[in-house]
């Protein structure tokens, strides 16, 4: 395994040197974890992170993994996956979705409208003049965005208290298991606290 990684790194580096490229697709960035890809972030102090990227849903405080990948995927393309996962788990569609602005693409808005699912993203276009209905909608959106902020807090809590921050496994399968078990552990603790 290690020898294959070294050989692949050599091939990639040689290709970059010969063709005078600055980057290459699926570039290996870790000798021991050749499946890991860099994930560019917009966070302060951390421009690039390495590891798995997980798309989560939060239902009644429980975190559920809808999509897990070591590749840098665009979250906005995975909204249908999350809705399908919800429907499989609960045998119904969600009434509403509290989501980040990145999910507010025209395709996603159209998809949610077709499924009669309310979304907590701002409407496209100009805001209507002093309309009572639009004010109520804005208040509802703000309330749902506060719920979404709880998800961010739950992720931070899971990184600190449930070993999601430091994954100590050595291959892709065990790393996925580690992440799933950390989420499971968090959800069990939450269920026990609610009893």
Region spans (language model):
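Flexible loop/turn segments at secondary-structure boundaries
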Residues: 38-39, 63-65, 72-74, 103-108, ...
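Structured core elements
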Residues: 30, 55-57, 64, 98, ...
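A contiguous, basic/glycine-rich beta-loop/short-helix subdomain that forms a polymer-engagement track
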Residues: 5-45
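Charge-patterned, long linear interaction tracts outside catalytic cores
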Residues: 170-195
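Electropositive, glycine- and tryptophan-enriched low-complexity nucleic-acid-binding patches
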Residues: 43-89
């Amino acid at each position: 395994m290690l020898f294959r990684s070294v050989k692949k790194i050599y091939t990639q580096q040689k290709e970059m040197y010969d063709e005078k490229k600055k980057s290459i697709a699926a570039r290996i960035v870790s000798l021991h974890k050749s499946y890991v890809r860099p994930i560019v972030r917009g966070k302060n102090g951390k421009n690039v992170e390495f590891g798995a990227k997980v798309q989560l849903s939060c239902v009644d405080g429980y975190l559920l993994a809808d999509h897990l990948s070591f590749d840098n995927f665009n979250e906005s393309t995975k909204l249908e996956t999350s809705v399908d996962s919800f429907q499989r788990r609960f045998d119904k569609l969600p009434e509403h979705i509290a989501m980040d602005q990145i999910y507010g693409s025209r395709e996603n808005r159209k998809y949610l409208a077709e499924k009669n699912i309310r979304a907590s993203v701002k409407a496209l276009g100009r805001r209507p003049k002093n309309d009572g209905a639009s004010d109520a909608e804005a208040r509802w959106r703000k309330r749902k965005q506060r719920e979404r902020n709880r998800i961010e807090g739950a992720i931070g809590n899971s990184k600190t208290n449930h070993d999601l921050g430091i994954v100590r496994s050595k291959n892709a399968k065990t790393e996925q298991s580690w992440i799933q078990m950390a989420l499971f552990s968090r959800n069990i603790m939450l269920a026990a606290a609610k009893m």
